[in-house]
Amino acid sequence: MTSAAPAAAQFAAPAPAAMGIYDRRHHPLAAGVWGDHPFIRPDTTASTSNAAAAAMVVAPPPLTEPKFESQLALPLQHGDDQDNAAALQESPRHASDSFEQEASKPRDKIQRRLAQNREAARKSRLRKKAYIQNLETSRMKLAHLEQEITRARQQSAYINRSSNPATLPAPIDSGVVTFEVEYAQWVEEQGRQTAELRASLQAAAEGPELRAVVEAALAHYDRLFAAKREAARRDVFFVMSGVWRTGAERFFLWIAGFRPSEVIRVLAPQLEPMTERQAADVQGLQQKARHLEDALSQGMDKLKQTLADSLLAEAVVVSTSCDASPPPPPPEEEEPSSSAAGDGGCYMAQMGSAMGRLSNLVAFVDHVRHRRSPPPTSHLHVRRRAELG
């Protein structure tokens, strides 16, 4: 019996030690109540076989330890669970991104509407500016027409007040009026071309495009000279006096224009920087212009002297013939005006015949114009010519 008891003790004793880890959750009731040898009475005198059988029947089976490590490692062993966990972690992120996209859609729509409104406002301002410019141009044309009407009314009133037809002023040639209208249009077109030149320079236009703009500006000046030539054929005194210009411009006029040498002298500082060849060409052009101006001035002086001599020589003959003619019957009230009319008619006839000699001067001017050198800007680069335009 003594040998059987230790064997039973060896069988039942390890249970408390094995359950020591889980003593907080699973208390070993059998070990705490019955001691080291549970279910065995010390005063028992039964046989060893019966005690062993009773111990084996009554003794509880050993508790198995739960494998928490395997349970904790279980999610790491399954790929589907990892994917599910990643999906659970990413689902809030996708939800937030979709919410931000939904929230950004109204902002994008507002920005597009604001951009459309700004573009519409810009186009409206451009249309308003063009409309105002058209109104200003129309106003200037209307003012010019009003001036023409006022001038025509004054001339008609002066004609109506005159009593003697011989003292009437010469009628205004339609070519002169046409030149004044064309000159006003030419000035307006010149302003537009100047603005176009500046815009091309600021936009850094290419060579061919800029050259076309410069050539158009030069052709515009050629049209002015052609209009002057036609007006001079109608009324040379109108063109020579330059009544269509301002008082300051008329002070510097020379034969219905400005001296080319003076124009070159004013433009020369603006042509810098130039190469040595360009500077020599400009200087030679200025000297040639001065020689032609001197020749033309001498021709004008000779013409004036010829006209003065002709008028003085013919004045004696005219006055003698006018005095020798039988005087008209003296009217009662218009005697002074009739005598003045007779003298004025004689002198105006002689003046008209003398002014016929201006054809020589016209031929001389045409000769100079055909022999003129190219403009001073022809020696420069097209961009510098545009800057001077």
Curated annotation (Swiss-Prot):
A biological process from GO: DNA-templated transcription
Chain residue ranges for the region called Disordered: 80-110, 320-345, 370-389
Any one annotated GO CC term: nucleus
Presence of keyword DNA-binding: yes
Compartment list: Nucleus
Family annotation (SUPFAM superfamilies): Leucine zipper domain (SSF57959)
Pfam families the record matches: bZIP_1, DOG1
Major place of residence: nucleus
GO molecular function term, any single one: DNA-binding transcription factor activity
Domain bZIP: 107-151
Biased composition (Basic and acidic residues): 91-110
Ranges of compositional bias, category Basic residues: 380-389
Span list, region Basic motif: 109-129
Keyword terms, alphabetized: DNA-binding, Nucleus, Plant defense, Transcription, Transcription regulation
DOG1 domain sequence ranges: 176-389
Region (Leucine-zipper): 135-149
Cross-referenced SMART domains: BRLZ (SM00338)
Function comment: Transcriptional regulator involved in defense response.
UniProt record similarity statement: Belongs to the bZIP family.
PANTHER family: TRANSCRIPTION FACTOR TGA9, TRANSCRIPTION FACTOR TGAL10
Name of the protein: Transcription factor TGAL10
